[in-house]
């Protein structure tokens, strides 16, 4: 499908990036099209059998000194630790704290599942908001201990609703009881959690990355076939400045 699309993208960065990757990674000068797709496929697969096209081979060839992956705090970091102990890997590989599901209270079923995973990985029994915050902080500490200095966040719009702790506690309990939070409650809970995390990041002198305007899972068909983050996202067109300004201002209080 991509080979049929790429000839129509001349002038778009995707056209140039595609051919730069073919050239730089595989030494292939042929322009990608339906007529050349099979030939390029065969050439690229032959190259992938060579050591310099392995994961470590490519990192060495492009002189990558540091590589940061994006990682859900409810998942393990055992592979990062194994890589750190492998003297043959010259590239430093660190996790990046990506807690996108930490405020997903509008979908109680998925939120409960995620909290259960966080509970297991953090070894903290989560029965209320205080436990939840402690578990998030413990994962920040763990990421920091193995070299992480980055967090990464994606929002359709930045959170800019600032509830009391009591309100956040009630929203957490509502979702934990299997009841979906409404959009206003979800925005309030997201603001509360994000502000809490920002304070943790600041205390450890981390860099926080924010991606605004990502419109997720546009295609139900793709979502049902492959799940989230499988190519069904696009750029949103919601206003960003006012809410981002309000959030950054709140951080300074």
How would you label these PLM feature ranges?
Residues 1-204, 253:
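Metal-cofactor-binding active-site regions of metalloenzymes
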Residues 180-253:
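Long, well-ordered mid-to-C-terminal structural blocks that present hydrophobic/aromatic surfaces
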